[in-house]
Amino acid sequence: MLNVVILAAGLGKRMQSDLPKVLHTLAGRPMLDHVIGSARQLQPARIIVVVGHGADRVKAAFEGQPGLQFALQQPQHGTGHAVQQAVPQLLEGDGEDDVTLVLYGDVPLVQPATLQNLLQARGRGVAVLTEVLADSTGYGRIVRDAQGQVCRIVEHKDASEAERAIKEVNTGILAAPTARLKDWLGRITNDNAQGEYYLTDVIGLAVGDGVPVGAAQPGASWETLGVNSRVQQAQLERAWQSELARRQLEAGVTLADPARFDVRGTLSCGRDVFIDVGCVFEGTVTLGDGVRVGPHCVLRDVAVQAGARIEAYSHLQQAKVGQEAVVGPYARLRPGADLGERSHVGNFVEIKNSVLQADSKANHLAYIGDADIGARVNVGAGTITCNYDGVNKHRTVIEDDAFIGSDTQLVAPVRVGKGATLGAGTTLTKDAPAGQLTISRARQSTIEGWKRPVKKS
């Protein structure tokens, strides 16, 4: 049985923020959410988040998540004291296979594979996640005995000169038998330079009790990087985005510049996808085979089918784009926009909660809201569906093969029949019959002999 305890009680003073540190985002998600996500991959019986500063806000951010519980650390007296607060909620069976894994809410990128390796490294005892650093200043040092076995961890402030020369450091992440961990937590003291209860002291207690202590290392150095300041947050953001870019490149995606690419959610790409510079992908985004995304586009919760093109500076949110459709440049698809195959949505066109079926086009300067547009429809420049009467929204229906002239207003609810034509400048307030020309503008006239006024001297 596996328990996971995540320490998330810290103030984060150096963040200079009223927001609890673990709620600051990395790749569009709270740091704590990354840790919980990795923990869930291990299928634990219980996840316990130890909260302190901003406890109510942290709880509210994750309220209702299954298998998630909270323990309060108030005041904060160190990492050992933090885990002590979770002890009453730890699930325990009958043997050494009952394990508690301790993670940190401000070390957001530790990967499930690394945690699996750590659990395997403990055997029937304890395991710590360690790393070798060129500059180990500030970290707890891993002290090994003559046989190379981990015998204790000493914090930097309590370390001797010889111990400070050690390059192998403690990441803070460990796994231990639950029953023994409870016992060791009851035996640690605050007799140290900080006057705190260190979780690391359980290693010395384990060795004293004859319990073997193993060690594992992360798959990548960025996995154990913590965040204590805005600078570190920005550095870790770039490290993670670089990793996400590498994964896309290895999967066959072409990135014009991997250093100018941001994923703040999940991006799934088919074959031969091209992504230009400065693009941001949020939520869940799917790009089909051969999709091309132009520079500086933002896609949030979007599905783009094969062969489609998203041109420069377009913003798409909760939208669907059909095969070989073209969007942009400078287009905006709002929630509920659904473009059929080979449809075109051009510059300065906004579409919201509307369907544009195959081969239809709205190439310039239009607003299409709450509309159902059939196939092979041409929507002229300056067209507006007037969908809101000040209280309620109404739908516009434009059937197949209709032609909507420029500068037309369609006052919903209204229907344009199949093959109908609306003359430029029409304000449509009644249904337009199929196959007919409907026009509402005044008849053009010329005033003979009219002259412009002359400016008086």
UniProtKB/Swiss-Prot annotation:
Primary subcellular site in the record, as a coarse category:
cytoplasm
Query: Its GO biological process terms?
Result: cell morphogenesis; cell wall organization; lipid A biosynthetic process; peptidoglycan biosynthetic process; regulation of cell shape; UDP-N-acetylglucosamine biosynthetic process
Chain residue ranges for the region called N-acetyltransferase: 252-457
Q: What class of enzyme is it?
A: transferase
Which keywords, in A-to-Z order, does the entry hold? Acyltransferase, Cell shape, Cell wall biogenesis/degradation, Cytoplasm, Magnesium, Metal-binding, Multifunctional enzyme, Nucleotidyltransferase, Peptidoglycan synthesis, Repeat, Transferase
Q: Where is this region: Pyrophosphorylase?
A: 1-230
State what protein this is by name: Bifunctional protein GlmU
Organism lineage reads as: Bacteria, Pseudomonadati, Pseudomonadota, Betaproteobacteria, Burkholderiales
